Amino acid sequence: MWEKEHYCIDTHTSVGCAVYENYKKASGDGTFTVMLSTASPYKFPHSVLSAIFGTAPADEFDCADKLKSMGVEEPVQIAELKGKKVLHSLVCDKDKMAETMLTWAEK
């Protein structure tokens, strides 16, 4: 979509577009179709930029800045997060999630 239309879409919508394009080629069906996006490119910025350019910044805010520089409107919620203090930085493996949360809740 980016190469043809210079329009940036999220990863979920890109799957839908690919399925539709494959269907059109296989069936010859030229029926007018409307594709609705299911998310913003800002939801998966690293994946979106990697798909377009083959690489992407490691930092999510750097990815957001890159999307913005491409003309993709930045959601106000993302812009407001930049520079804010991180309140919770606890990270755990998914198989330890219940145990970790119980320990955290006891504090």
Residue ranges with predicted function:
Residues M1-K107:
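PLP-dependent amino-acid enzyme catalytic core
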